[in-house]
């Protein structure tokens, strides 16, 4: 999982990327291409 300041550019890399908030953190998850996982931090 990558840790990035801004997830906007990471989200646009694949059309299945979803922006999710869990426990006060923002994540990018992708069910089809798992390598696009990222967390904002």
Swiss-Prot record:
Coiled coil, from the record: none
UniProt record, GO biological process: translation
Domain of life: Bacteria
PROSITE patterns: RIBOSOMAL_L36
Record keywords, A-Z: Ribonucleoprotein, Ribosomal protein
GO molecular function: structural constituent of ribosome
InterPro entries reported for this sequence: Ribosomal_bL36, Ribosomal_bL36_sp, Ribosomal_L36_bact
A GO CC term assigned to this protein in UniProt: ribonucleoprotein complex
Pfam family name, one: Ribosomal_L36
Alphabetized PANTHER family for the sequence: 50S RIBOSOMAL PROTEIN L36 2, LARGE RIBOSOMAL SUBUNIT PROTEIN BL36B
NCBIfam families: PRK00831.1, rpmJ_bact
HAMAP family (alphabetical): Ribosomal_bL36
UniProt family annotation: Belongs to the bacterial ribosomal protein bL36 family.
Protein name, UniProt field: Large ribosomal subunit protein bL36
UniProt source species: Nitrobacter winogradskyi (strain ATCC 25391 / DSM 10237 / CIP 104748 / NCIMB 11846 / Nb-255)
Record lineage: Bacteria, Pseudomonadati, Pseudomonadota, Alphaproteobacteria, Hyphomicrobiales
Gene: rpmJ
């Amino acid at each position: 999982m990558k840790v990035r300041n801004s997830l906007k550019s990471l989200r646009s890399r694949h059309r299945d990327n979803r922006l999710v908030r869990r426990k006060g953190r923002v994540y990018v998850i992708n069910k089809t291409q798992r390598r696009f996982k990222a967390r904002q931090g």
